[in-house]
Each structure stands twice: as structure tokens, then as C-alpha cells.
A protein has these predicted regions:
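Conserved, structured core segments of small domains
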Residues: 1-98
């Protein structure tokens, strides 16, 4: 299944010192999930600080484990909203049956 994972700060925005201490761990951990095929796509949010991941997982709970396992999640700095997504099923009504 595919799950949209939309980040938000779990508490007040981290200080520059907190951010600078964790980013050297966050980036490689995120890239590993991408290279492992867990994160299919990733975007930077334009309306607020944060990211959006399209995650391949067996369930929403599995997606939660993956993204909360990232260093910012483990440090309690980042939380996510999780939205399971799939094919646009109503389009099937537009296909003529023979």
C-alpha cells in the first residue's frame, strides 16, 4: 500500500543547534529508506517547514514505524499525519463494459 506521510513539528521548532546536531544523521537515514524502496517519492513543503513522503508499506502502522524511526522522529522533534492512498477507483465507471 502507499501512504502519504506529511511532517509537522512535534513541539516548538528546534533551535539551530538542535537542527544542526541531528541533520547529519537525518539525511543519510532518509536516503537509506529511499534506496531501500520504502520512500518512493519525497517533497519539501512549500507552505510550511517540513517534508511529504510517499511511502510503500504493508500498512499505515508499518509506515509509521519507518518514518518515526528517522532521527528527528526518535528525538521527538518531528511528527507526521498519515493518509493511505490508492488508485482512483471511480475512474473504473468510465470504462465501457463489453
Amino acid at each position: 500500500m502507499k501512504v502519504l506521510c506529511i511532517s509537522k513539528w512535534a513541539k516548538a521548532r528546534p533551535s539551530p543547534e538542535e537542527r544542526d546536531a541531528i541533520l547529519p544523521k537525518e539525511v543519510p537515514a532518509t536516503l537509506k529508506l529511499y534506496l531501500d524502496g520504502v520512500i518512493e517519492q519525497m517533497w519539501f513543503k512549500l507552505d510550511a517547514p517540513g517534508v511529504v513522503f510517499l511511502v510503500n508499506a504493508e500498512s499505515v502502522d508499518a509506515a509509521k514505524i519507518h518514518v518515526h524511526g528517522l532521527p528527528m522522529g526518535q528525538a521527538g522533534l518531528m511528527d507526521f499525519d498519515f493518509i493511505p492512498v490508492g488508485p482512483l477507483a471511480p475512474l473504473g465507471m468510465l470504462i465501457a463494459e463489453k
